[in-house]
Amino acid sequence: MAQAYWQCYPWLVLLCACAWSYPEPKYLGREDVRNCSTSPERLPVTAVNTTMRLAALRQQMETWNLSAYIIPDTDAHMSEYIGKPDKRREWISGFTGSAGTAVVTMGKAAVWTDSRYWTQAERQMDCNWELHKEVSISSIVAWILAEVPDGQNVGFDPFLFSVDSWKNYDQGFQDSSRHLLSVTTNLVDVAWGSERPPVPSQPIYALPKEFTGSTWQEKVSAVRSYMEHHAKTPTGVLLSALDETAWLFNLRSSDIPYNPFFYSYALLTNSSIRLFVNKSRFSLETLQYLNTNCTLPMCVQLEDYSQVRDSVKAYASGDVKILIGVSYTTYGVYEVIPKEKLVTDTYSPVMLIKAVKNSKEQALLKSSHVRDAVAVIQYLVWLEKNVPKGTVDEFSGAEYIDELRRNENFSSGPSFETISASGLNAALAHYSPTKELHRKLSSDEMYLVDSGGQYWDGTTDITRTVHWGTPTAFQKEAYTRVLMGNIDLSRLVFPAATSGRVIEAFARRALWEVGLNYGHGTGHGIGNFLCVHEWPVGFQYNNIAMAKGMFTSIEPGYYHDGEFGIRLEDVALVVEAKTKYPGDYLTFELVSFVPYDRNLIDVRLLSPEQLQYLNRYYQTIRENVGPELQRRQLLEEFAWLEQHTEPLSARAPHIISWTSLWVASALAILSWSS
């Protein structure tokens, strides 16, 4: 799944500083977006009335003597996906986009979001809200300074601000006479009242031993060893990200959409283990699993989730040093640790240790990808039969591939919202259809499906782009060049400890040669029944160096605005490279096992090395997925796989007829019965 990155250079900040608006002229006259320039104002049926919500929040602001209140789109753990109780910006503004910040003053309200969501915001917000289109913290601060008088307070919930975000806001207000005030009571929650969705209370369970790479005791020992050998010898480490506690204790639940996590913190010291969580969610069996009935170094002491700030403050009063990973720690716990007792790294030891999978974890992830490939192949076969009938749309397609995954063994649902995009919608890198808004799939258009699953043995993420008709020469070239980029990076041999950003350009080279490019990241880490976007692995500037045992996606793309989009994404394991001469070198081994669309490949563009690599990959797909299809007697899918993984050559035909598929199916049946 592609991850976008947005940045604004200094000159652009100056240009955009005042780039806020009510609906632009291009929206006027449209009934699907708001028009605040008329009297009375015209709102679409999708707009949310926020007048009473804002009044309730402003009443709380008055109680706390605040002239402005900042509402980010995060939770207390800096999660990528957030639960319903944490969708505070969505509730107060009506805007449901995944990225954006709201600020409310006593007289105005504004939302900042990027270009992916501008139209959506105009459809969902009423005229109480301004829409700002420059998303930097500096632009938010500039607006607040213009709206809030000297000497007034600007409030925020410290549990919703990362350490770095707080520093940026604090720096912005330093030279002004406004005061940035930490308020641990969330005022939106108070205004929301009884209508706020309850915090989940489903059971927290321990993963069966066969689905874990190490026991939780072994993991705790590894983290303590890391602390012991750390240059600043911390006595404890605070874990704030939800995947950290889930991984450390081999525990899972369902508090967060698409992620098997539960609200929690952990404070691990040399001699104790504290897990901050809702204790009522554990069964007696799980309590015994965690050794909660003792106080020895390998016993887990359960404390209430809400007590983490006070407990960390109490621990910090002793002769201690506390290590935190600032990327996922909020200011809410950071501010109670004296600076002389604080040890800061970008990432916690848990983040670094779990990034490198051991041999069992590698085997588990691979097995999940084999079953996942079966589901994707079933989907592609189904599409080939049904799209020409005109019976499939983007939304029904997304529902069907999710259903196919749910039917797989050890499935726990999708790993993110399926991106099912036809034609021009595929040019939007993060488009997802809805029941109300979607396009019908057509044999005359390209179709992009980016999807993934959560299984007890692994998390998956794969993107394929297909065309069932006659693609244009440009579409074939663009697709082939995206494929060339995928191959060039996947087959690359590089020195150990190389940063992903150093080699990322290999995925873009074939596109750059003809003046094409893409605007999202090239890849991200992936977990074992954890995050589909698992930091700190990947190809961006703030990712750690590549190491044997890491998993990353490789996903170049190309997006032709208003016409089509292409992305080819595979998950790869970092392995030792076999080189002619001795040396410490690495390469990638793909664990996604679904062939690319032969109808879109211009083999003439591929080098002999690229073609050889592609054919070897196809042989690997046959060896890994073929037996599973045969075992399940999925005859049609097996025939499809055999046809679509036939070796390619410069003169090989690329289009496969359904007649040939049925012939292959018959031959497969005969071979099994003999």
UniProtKB/Swiss-Prot annotation:
GO terms for molecular function: metal ion binding; metalloaminopeptidase activity. Membrane-bound metalloprotease which catalyzes the removal of a penultimate prolyl residue from the N-termini of peptides, such as Arg-Pro-Pro. May play a role in the metabolism of the vasodilator bradykinin. Pfam families: Creatinase_N, Creatinase_N_2, Peptidase_M24, Peptidase_M24_C. Its EC number is 3.4.11.9. Substrate binds at R116, H430, H524, H533, E555. The keyword Iron-sulfur does not apply. Keywords: Aminopeptidase, Cell membrane, Glycoprotein, GPI-anchor, Hydrolase, Lipoprotein, Membrane, Metal-binding, Protease, Signal, Zinc. This is Xaa-Pro aminopeptidase 2. It catalyses: Release of any N-terminal amino acid, including proline, that is linked to proline, even from a dipeptide or tripeptide. Homotrimer. It comes from Mus musculus. Belongs to the peptidase M24B family. InterPro entries: Creatin/AminoP/Spt16_N, Creatinase/aminopeptidase-like, Creatinase_N, Pept_M24, Pept_M24B, Peptidase_M24_C, Peptidase_M24B_aminopep-P_CS, X-Pro_aminopeptidase_P. It is a lipid-anchor; GPI-anchor. GO terms for cellular component: extracellular exosome; plasma membrane; side of membrane. Glycans are attached at N65, N270, N278, N293. CDD domains: APP. It comes from the Eukaryota. Zn(2+) 1 binds at D450, D461, E569. Residues 1-22 form the signal peptide.
